[in-house]
């Protein structure tokens, strides 16, 4: 369970206990299909671990509380929640996500002057149009930004969610 100020649905690898016993079930889960259920927050934490050498900070909503005169009442102090994977795994995933932006399906996420990594996704939802996903990060001038975008029943992740993710990354890097 993610320690968070708001309720968060738990992720789910499989609804039926025997699904992950089969090689087909494992393969479907590995590429984000099958019975896997995740939220944008959970996926944003995965991308955060990628850019933080495998560690996940405890997520928070409010960074700072100020009085009307501008003085600080309270400021959030970032803490590490857990280690998701090793430094080496984080570097490998980061390199793959950057490669995807430079050469793969996520090329539309390029931002001039920034190092950008991304992963598009198109999640099947029965007989309905698929959910469009984009998970990405950008690094520029010492700033690291992570986004997770899902557009329910939006279609292709590369065509629908990626442009939204790129716009969010660019706005955050530009201080908007």
Describe each region flagged by the PLM.
Residues 70-79, 162-176:
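Short, gly/Ser/Thr-rich active-site loops of penicillin-recognizing serine hydrolases
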